[in-house]
Amino acid sequence: MTKPNADSLMKIGQLKKPYGIKGWLWVFSETEEREAIFSYSPWWMKTATGFKPLTVTQWRRQGTGIVAQFEQVPDRNVAETMNGVSIWIDKDSLPSTEEDEYYWSDLVGLSVINKQDECLGTVKELFETGAHPIMKVVPSQDSIDDEPRMIPWHKQTVDVVDLAAGRMVVDWERDF
């Protein structure tokens, strides 16, 4: 298997604690539908020495989560060392997005500018809350202050996303 280009990879999940004695692991999926993570391949795991292949041999729902067994994890002893390992795929294996639709990984790193043309910071991450996703915006060199912000990812809040320019415009006052 050819080594991946790290710049073309996107994180889609993470391995969690072992399940059972045969090397199975809990899998935390960052895909919109939890089981959709298994429709993408090949998987890559990020290690201290670079990206290595991670091959799913079987998976299943277990309670409210999902567990999987991997070719590279023969037993529980190895599984114990895998907790926290991130799962990556090549972005080229993803379907194209529609207009005004974005992969969260494409939004991370964008500058966030409000309607008053003030830089509020940079998108560090997005996370789901139930009602709607939230962008964690952290101060940047160009931001108006040193305040981190939690800004809803919502059509009433986000006016413009310009991936090419590396910025988004939001309807968000500096003192919200």
From Swiss-Prot:
Listed under GO biological process in this entry are: ribosomal small subunit biogenesis; rRNA processing
Where do the PRC barrel domain residues begin and end?
99-176
Q: Which UniProt keywords apply?
A: Chaperone, Cytoplasm, Ribosome biogenesis, rRNA processing
Q: Cellular location of this protein?
A: Cytoplasm
Q: Which GO terms describe its cellular component?
A: cytoplasm; ribosome
Domain of life of the source = Bacteria
Q: What GO annotations for molecular function exist for this entry?
A: ribosome binding
Subunit organization? Binds ribosomal protein uS19.
Q: What does this protein do?
A: An accessory protein needed during the final step in the assembly of 30S ribosomal subunit, possibly for assembly of the head region. Essential for efficient processing of 16S rRNA. May be needed both before and after RbfA during the maturation of 16S rRNA. It has affinity for free ribosomal 30S subunits but not for 70S ribosomes.
Matches recorded under NCBIfam families: 16S_RimM
Please give the family membership noted in the entry: Belongs to the RimM family.
Which PANTHER family does the entry link to? RIBOSOME MATURATION FACTOR RIMM
Q: Domain notes, please?
A: The PRC barrel domain binds ribosomal protein uS19.
User: Mind telling me what this protein is named?
Assistant: Ribosome maturation factor RimM
Q: What is the species of this protein?
A: Psychrobacter sp. (strain PRwf-1)
